[in-house]
Regions:
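N-terminal Lys/Arg-rich, disordered targeting/topogenic segments
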Residues: 1-21
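Surface-exposed loop/turn motifs at beta-strand-loop junctions within extracellular Ig-like
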Residues: 380-382
Length: 401
């Protein structure tokens, strides 16, 4: 019988080393395979993410123009669509005399107007049409009206009323809002004949202040002059030369102010006359009575914390009745005099409207007509009382509101 050769201890060690080497090779190969598989998986994953990111980016950056406008954009566009047909451009001419001849030129101070009746009444700023020898009105559809008359002016508010001869044409008047209810921060839209060249330019912004007094330099159709206005609405909606007389609108498309002035020493500040200040005179004009402005006959200063401290009143807001220079606080024979108002009274309400918060005495009285009876809530010697006043008609040259 053949016998297998016996392995020596050295041979056994060599065999074990060979087996271990094979095992290590297998492990190394497996590790390499695992690394390859993981790398491929990561590559596929990253490609997928990149592809999804590209799709997302393409979804967000639309080039087909189908993205819906925001609610804010839609609101401004809706107001513009609704109101633009009721806003007109005004172009004036004047006759200037020289030592040699009389020349006629077109004024550079073109303006804007608001249609306030179906039969052709327009409201604008007085300085836009003052001393004009002829006036042309251009509607938003391009229709030109050359037969235009100034039918009334309210110089205290820089307001003028025009009448167009429209024949059988029915115009679309703008709806008037309530300027006593406007709030700081409220969104507004302005429309006007910007720079006298760009008809129905639309801008938007917010009400940035209320009750602002402004001394404005206006050129209009004559030499530059200064006009002092009170209780104006301040806005950051862009209002440019040529926008004077145009509407300041709320988001419902209602007129809450008539644009009148721009702060030349600051950007983003414009002013508008509260619409309530012209409602009374508008009623009289539409009734064919011309401008009849309601009159109280009291001189006052609007209270601030500093003024209240100076005059020694406990009232926080309102109109403090006081003398103005050498002029008495109450105009003799005026409605205020007949109703028994006194110096140092504080007018806190006119009917239900709060003086100060909702306007000053001038603009709040402007909503009424001569002959109207209003209830004034006053603070006298620390006690509140109500007096009834029958307003009279303002006569040019009278002072006091």
């Amino acid at each position: 019988m053949n016998q297998q050769p016996q392995m020596t201890a050295q041979d056994q060690r060599a065999a074990r080393a060979m087996r271990q080497s094979k095992i290590m090779s297998i492990i190394a190969a497996g590790a390499l395979a695992l690394v390859f598989v993981v790398a491929m998986a990561m590559w596929v994953y990253l490609r997928t993410i990149d592809r999804n990111a590209t799709v997302t980016e393409r979804d967000q950056v639309s080039t087909d123009g189908n993205l819906a406008p925001t609610a804010d954009e839609s609101a401004v566009a809706n107001v513009a669509d609704k109101a633009s047909k009721s806003v007109v451009s005004i172009i004036t001419n004047i006759e200037e005399s020289s030592s040699l001849r009389t020349t006629t030129r077109q004024s550079a101070a073109a303006g804007t107007g608001i249609i306030v009746s179906k039969d052709g009444y327009i409201v604008t700023n007085k300085h836009v049409v003052s001393k004009a020898s002829s006036i042309r009105v251009i509607a938003s559809d391009g229709t030109r009206y050359d037969d235009v008359r100034v039918v009334g002016e309210d110089p205290l508010n820089d307001i003028a009323y025009l009448k167009l001869e429209v024949g059988n044409t029915v115009l679309t008047p703008l709806s008037l809002g309530d300027s006593a209810t406007v709030r700081v921060g409220q969104s507004v839209v302005a429309i006007g004949n910007a720079l006298g060249r760009y008809q129905n330019t639309v801008t938007s912004g917010i009400i940035s202040g209320k009750g602002r007094p402004v001394t404005a330099s206006t050129s209009g159709n004559s030499a530059q002059r200064t006009e002092s206005l009170t209780d104006l609405i301040q806005t950051d909606a862009a209002v440019n030369s040529g926008n004077s007389g145009g509407p300041l609108l709320n988001r419902s498309g209602q007129v809450i102010g008539i644009n009148v002035a721009v702060a030349t020493n600051a950007q983003g500040i414009s002013f508008a006359i509260p619409v309530n200040a012209m409602k009374g005179t508008l009623k009289s004009v539409l009734a064919g009575k011309g401008v009849r402005r309601a009159y109280l006959g009291a001189r006052y200063v609007m209270l601030t914390p500093d003024i209240a401290k100076q005059v020694g009143t406990s009232a926080k807001e309102g109109a403090y009745v006081m003398t103005s220079g050498e002029k008495s606080a109450i105009v003799a024979g005026s409605p205020a005099d007949k109703a028994g108002l006194r110096e140092k009274d504080v007018i806190t309400k006119i009917n239900s409207l709060v003086v100060g918060k909702q306007g000053d005495v001038s603009s709040l009285i402007g909503e009424y007509q001569p002959g109207d009876v209003v209830a004034l809530t006053i603070l006298r010697d620390g006690k509140e009382r109500v007096v009834r006043v029958t307003l009279s008609e303002y006569q040019g040259g009278e002072s006091g509101e």
